[in-house]
């Protein structure tokens, strides 16, 4: 358990100590929270920006609206920790697909296109080594972790599961849970 202000963050299982790869493999909200707290708000916000989460995607397609992240001057630890595992963010399916393509593209972010276009702009957002390490962690998640039900034998793959509560109008989160999987 991780106690922050009046919030308690828990994982589905108790872990002694996890590596960054294991945090991804086992979907550790405590681990993701600690990383976010260590990075700090400005670096976390910058990383979300680099991965395309806070800007529009340059396609004209339904559901391609850009994501949202509350910009705050005085963020408290529990809010920062929640951003570490994706709460407080709203992103489109195209944005999550673009972000995960960074790991398969050796750390390069490429603008999302629906049709093949050889002139797609791209930029490095993480090192090849970091992309490789995250890709290996995503592969572990589909072999041994929370995404193993999505494993398809005979294919090289990686994925990450997610469980979220949608933001309610006003304040707080809806009680309904939504499950997701991103697979590369």
Task: Give the residues covered by each predicted segment.
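Calmodulin-binding IQ motif helices
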Residues: 184
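Beta-lactam-recognizing serine transpeptidase/beta-lactamase-like catalytic domain environment
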Residues: 1-181
């Amino acid at each position: 358990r991780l106690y922050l202000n009046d919030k308690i963050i828990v994982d589905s299982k108790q872990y002694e100590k996890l590596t960054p790869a294991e945090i991804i493999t086992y979907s550790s909200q405590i681990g993701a929270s600690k990383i976010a707290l260590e990075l700090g708000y400005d670096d976390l916000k910058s990383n979300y920006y680099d991965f395309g989460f806070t800007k529009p995607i340059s396609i004209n397609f339904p559901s391609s609206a850009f994501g949202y992240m509350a910009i705050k001057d005085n963020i408290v630890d529990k809010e920062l920790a929640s951003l570490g595992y994706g709460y407080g963010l709203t992103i489109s399916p195209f944005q999550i697909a673009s972000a995960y393509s960074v790991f398969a593209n050796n750390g390069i972010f490429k603008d999302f296109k629906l049709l093949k276009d050889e002139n797609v702009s791209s930029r490095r957002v993480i090192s090849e080594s970091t992309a490789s390490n995250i890709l290996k962690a995503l592969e572990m998640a589909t072999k041994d972790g929370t995404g193993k039900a999505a494993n398809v034998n005979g294919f090289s793959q990686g994925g990450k599961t997610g469980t979220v509560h949608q933001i309610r109008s006003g304040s707080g989160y809806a009680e309904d849970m939504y499950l997701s999987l991103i697979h590369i």
